[in-house]
């Protein structure tokens, strides 16, 4: 009545009853955790039965028509079961099995875990090592805001959401500086409920009309949203056989040394790289951040882009006025050539590794991975370097149990 009278959207909470056990055809009373009287009382107010009675009372449908619809539904379900199953020769009397001819080919098992990346065909890519155009020095954190500004201006499909991103002059670090004022309908501050807004982002990504950029203020908070992040968003393409795109970008930051405690600092790379469906990128320079975020937003798979608080205040060369290029997919960057040792690293550990190599006088090859997940990592560059040096060191800040280096090794 509130909605009918123009009172606006209304939440209706309807309590319903699960009449049967978690699996199988038996009611809960058969297992002793419900009584038959309780089940009967709920059956008397079953919404399906009540709707049927209202339809008859209002002369919308007759009782005979409703019964006919019931029979049609039962017949359709029975027909489907007959087509899909057959008597199980090794089972109990009356048991059935899926027809062997209907089982999918084993080669189909990984179909749809990720897309084929055809959406990247023809993308304009740049590399700092070969860039010869006009350049300027920019702070890392300013570039984060600028490239998101460019994508928000370019497409109404891009929606940004997260805690405090609409205030504090661009969130806790300035990554969304000025964006809420320019795009008030698409830069959305959220409640402190990662499970809720991650799920919202996953839903609108699957819907196909939006490309959400969701921020987890700290990666440790992913555990609050673990079901949405790993069971829903990460697995959605596979669940639908690759037919449904999931253009979802998750931004988060490593905060080692920030003083916020062990619940606000983790490196989530190892966790995401051992979880199906996710692509993982990490930029160590402002130049690479532009290209990696643009690539992440172009890809129709869920992508987590990991940042680091230590990099936000650093500066680096970027193209003047160009925030539209991508970093080549699946390509690492060799930051220093060497013959004695291969160092595989990412984020702020790239510069730390370069500094350590110089201080120690070691002729090491430092490889900035950039693309971290199994399906995207540059195995060719890694392989060539290891063949040359025959020695490997993986440098990261992850915890031992969930470390990226442990997985990569």
Task: Identify what each model region corresponds to.
Residues 71, 75-125:
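Terminal amphipathic helices with adjacent charged low-complexity linkers/tails
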Residues 45, 60-63, 67, 92, ...:
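Low-complexity, intrinsically disordered regions enriched in charged/polar residues
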């Amino acid at each position: 009545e509130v909605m009918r009278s123009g009172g606006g959207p209304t939440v209706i909470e309807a309590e319903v009853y699960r009449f049967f056990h978690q699996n199988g055809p038996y009611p809960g009373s058969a297992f002793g955790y419900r009584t038959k009287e309780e089940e009967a009382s709920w059956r008397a107010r079953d919404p399906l039965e009540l709707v049927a009675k209202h339809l008859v009372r209002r002369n919308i449908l007759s009782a005979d028509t409703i019964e006919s619809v019931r029979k049609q539904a039962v017949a359709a379900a029975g027909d489907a079961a007959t087509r899909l199953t057959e008597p199980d020769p090794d089972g109990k009397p009356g048991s059935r099995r899926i027809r062997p001819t209907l089982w999918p080919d084993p080669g189909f098992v990984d179909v749809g875990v990720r897309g084929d990346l055809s959406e990247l065909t023809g993308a304009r890519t740049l590399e700092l090592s070969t860039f010869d155009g006009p350049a300027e020095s920019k702070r890392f954190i300013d570039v984060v805001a600028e490239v998101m500004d460019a994508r928000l201006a370019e497409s109404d499909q891009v929606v940004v959401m997260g805690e405090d991103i609409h205030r504090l002059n661009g969130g806790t670090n300035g990554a969304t500086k000025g964006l809420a004022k320019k795009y008030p309908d698409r830069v959305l501050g959220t409640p402190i409920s990662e499970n809720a807004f991650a799920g919202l982002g996953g839903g609108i990504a699957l819907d196909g009309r939006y490309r959400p950029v969701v921020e987890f203020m700290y990666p440790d908070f992913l555990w609050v949203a673990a079901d949405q992040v790993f069971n829903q968003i990460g697995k959605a393409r596979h669940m639908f056989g690759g037919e449904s795109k999931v253009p979802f970008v998750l931004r988060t930051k490593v905060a080692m040394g920030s003083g916020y405690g062990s619940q606000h600092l983790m490196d989530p790379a190892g966790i995401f790289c051992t979880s199906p469906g996710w692509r993982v990128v990490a930029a160590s320079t402002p130049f690479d951040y532009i290209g990696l975020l643009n690539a992440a937003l172009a890809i129709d798979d869920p992508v987590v882009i990991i940042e680091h608080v230590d990099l936000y205040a650093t500066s680096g060369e970027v193209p003047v006025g160009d925030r539209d290029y991508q970093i080549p997919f699946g390509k690492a960057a060799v930051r220093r050539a060497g013959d004695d040792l291969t160092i595989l690293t990412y984020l702020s550990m790239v510069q730390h590794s370069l500094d350590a190599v110089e201080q120690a006088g070691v002729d090491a090859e430092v490889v900035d991975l950039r693309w971290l997940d199994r399906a995207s990592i540059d195995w060719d560059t890694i392989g060539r370097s290891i063949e040359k040096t025959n020695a490997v060191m993986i440098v990261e800040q992850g915890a031992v149990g969930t470390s990226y280096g442990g997985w990569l090794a």
